[in-house]
């Protein structure tokens, strides 16, 4: 079994507030290419943390690829309360993560920063690498997870970046 953690920018961090935004189609095209490459290398699980934006689009692509490839998806939420204060539209989108092949919560609710560090440790030590849409020049709170990943020897990271998206848009 090979599992890849999939994470990246949330939609609002990219200034995307509608699924009809043309950038979403470009991002999904890149995701599809990358997930197919992973599948052809033998990856059989894609692991998500339940964030809207890149993860949501990757989950949608993965679900489409299930028609052709034998793959599984999992969501490991940091907290059982994840998304509980979101509006109805976002709650509906979050439901996709709750319907993956495997769903678990690390903690009932947030109590301290130590929980997030432990959660990151768990994600890294229970996956075989990560696929990220992240650029260190445009930092978000994802930087903590990326830093923890980079500290691990033999933990491969594959980045989708803005330059590659521009190339795909120009095709």
UniProtKB/Swiss-Prot annotation:
Record Pfam families: YpsA
Membrane-spanning ranges: none
Gene3D superfamilies: 3.40.50.450
Residue ranges the record marks as coiled coil: none
Alphabetized InterPro entries for the sequence: YspA
SUPFAM superfamilies, per database record: MCP/YpsA-like
PANTHER family: UPF0398 PROTEIN SPR0331, UPF0398 PROTEIN YPSA
Protein family per UniProt: Belongs to the UPF0398 family.
Protein's name according to its UniProt entry: UPF0398 protein SEQ_1788
Lineage summary: Bacteria, Bacillati, Bacillota, Bacilli, Lactobacillales
